[in-house]
Structure formats: structure tokens, C-alpha cells
Amino acid sequence: STFKNFMLSYYDQDYDGAISPEEALRVTELYLGFDEEDEEAVPITSLKGIEYCKNLINLECDFNAITSLDLSGLDKLEYVDCSYNLIKTANLSGCISLKQLYANVNEIGALNLKECANLQLVQAYKNKLTACDVSGMSKLVYLDVSQNQLTTLNISNCSEMLIVNCGSNKLAALDLSGLEKLTSLGCYNNNLTTLDTSK
């Protein structure tokens, strides 16, 4: 695969044509963003094998053709940009160090962030999310889930939240309780009839 070829090019230090467990553990950053100007570049469709990169901290794989993202168990991962792919499913279970997630312009139908308690920023606009629950995530400051298909959004008790954009969804209700620091709310183009902004 394209991802395997990339790994062999940069991390096969003993040139044996395979990535050993020891070599995989040396990987802390992966920059796999697709370069349209490179005529020989081939977009990545799968990140199979990334689960062995247990010490990965930063992952950028935007502008590819990835259909499924499984980063489960990568407990040192802090930054992910997987925007502009074809991702339908994303597994972030066990990503306990994750601070920033950019997953814009994909086809993600569900996103479970409950094990990502250190998240500070989430961008997941232009997906197919029908529900999103980040309630009680005490470090989350910024959330953009606009242009999805959300019928429910639970953002209550996110005590550090400053900015929420949930415009262009199908929300009929929105609970803003416990958002004492909220400074910006975009909830345009929904089915809201009332909005209680008392904090």
C-alpha cells in the first residue's frame, strides 16, 4: 500500500523491506498530507499498520482517500488532522492524550470522543454526524460541527468552552447549561425555535 511504501522509505532503518516493532516505536510524527503538485504522488487509502506506532504524537494525513481511521490505543497521540478524506468510520478509543482533532470534510457518521478527555479543539464540519456528545469535557475550548446532520448535540458542562459552531444541522433543541465561558455560538440554519442563553 501507499502508506506501507511511505513507512519503508523513511523508517526501514535496516533496509530489510519490513518495518520491525522497534522501528515502528521510533515513529513520533507522520506527515502524510497529499501533495497535488507532485505528479508522482498517490493518495493514501489505508493507514493499516499505524497501530504499531505506539509512540506517535502528531498525525497529519489530510487530502488523501482514506475511508476508515482506526487510531485506537495510540495513547500518546496529541494532534490529528485527517481532513479532506473519505472517512466513514473513526475509532479514537484510548486516545487519552489527544488535544486537537481536525476531521473536516469527510463522511463520518458517528464520533465517540468520550475517552479523549484532554481534547481542547474539535473540528468536524461537513460530515454526516447525526449526534455528538462532548458533555462534561472540561478542557474543550473550541467545537465546530457545522454542516452535518445533527439532531442531537450535547455540549453541557464543558466549563472551558469558548466557541461553538453547530450551524446548518437539524437541531430542534440546544442545552447551553454549564458553559460559563462561552463567547461565540453559531447555531444558524437549524430547527431551533427557542434558545436559553442563561448560564
Task: Label every model-predicted segment.
Residues 23, 49-52, 62, 73, ...:
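C-terminal capping segment of individual leucine-rich repeats
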